[in-house]
Amino acid sequence: MSIALDSSTATAAAAPSPTRARIAALLALPLPELIFQAQTVHRQHFDPTQVQISTLLSIKTGGCPEDCGYCPQSAEFDVGVKASKLMDIAPVLEAARRAKEAGAQRFCMGAAWRSPKDHDLDRVAAMVEGVKALGMETCVTLGMLRPDQAARLKSAGLDYYNHNLDTSPEFYGSIITTRTYQDRLDTLAAVRDAGINICCGGIIGMGEDLDDRAGLLATLADLDPPPESVPINALVAVKGTKLGESAPIDPIDFVRTIAAARISMPRSWVRLSAGREALSDEAQALCFLAGANSIFYGDTLLTTANPAVARDNALFDRLGMTKLS
């Protein structure tokens, strides 16, 4: 299959796509009405008291040649992130064992590459096989993939491949110049053709407007089928990156984005991802009420802070929520 960027979303067209217009209308609703609609949809497809738990490990950190304006792992920015080589298999599997013992259902592995070299992909495939043998779901994010590379990961048993769109087609060029939006869609098509589930979302708070948020969610929702997993990130502004001086996003705006994602992609897992450390327990509770049902679990998320496991467990207890087993 191929995924082409619709010309109606590739430029700032006067008439937005029906999906985009519908999502823009959702984002403009009074918050109580929006959350009510999102929770109603959520209950039709999921147990609203359960949260899917994923853990993310950086298996190759820093030195990425891409110029993503938000990313401390880009070689374009001097932020003190030391580039590392791809990890050996044994410590990755040990980290996966610890994650499973802590309650994680899915183990995600991220490498800061533009795209993987084939010899590195062989080692990643062995990691996938080892994590699968532990009884966990697997996800990797390695950059752009060729169709044969996606097929190699599928043969290793990979469950999910993460490749985010980041933002709307219109706003994308102000954040990233070293790969195109279509490059990202091509990787998603290769992953889908290989029979791997897609994990794909974006980042809120990079200076985009509400229409850009609607454009991101519409592009995701219009994928056929939509991603099985949709991570929604709040920008973590790292000093020294292009977006390092960005103001924090209003938590209510973040909740609105979660709710619109849930309504527009009713069967997808909607994950609270980067930036959750800055959200209060009350803001996270609103996100769960708005349809979020997945988190990254663990004290770090690649190179940024994440809520402590003890804090998450205490929050789940207070809310009467349980981890999906």
From Swiss-Prot:
It catalyses: (4R,5S)-dethiobiotin + (sulfur carrier)-SH + 2 reduced [2Fe-2S]-[ferredoxin] + 2 S-adenosyl-L-methionine = (sulfur carrier)-H + biotin + 2 5'-deoxyadenosine + 2 L-methionine + 2 oxidized [2Fe-2S]-[ferredoxin]. Residues 49-267 form the Radical SAM core domain. Pathway: Cofactor biosynthesis; biotin biosynthesis; biotin from 7,8-diaminononanoate: step 2/2. [2Fe-2S] cluster binds at C108, C139, C199, R271. The keyword Nucleotidyltransferase does not apply. One of its GO terms (biological process) is biotin biosynthetic process. Its EC number is 2.8.1.6. Belongs to the radical SAM superfamily. Biotin synthase family. This is Biotin synthase. It comes from Acidiphilium cryptum (strain JF-5). The lineage of its organism: Bacteria, Pseudomonadati, Pseudomonadota, Alphaproteobacteria, Acetobacterales.
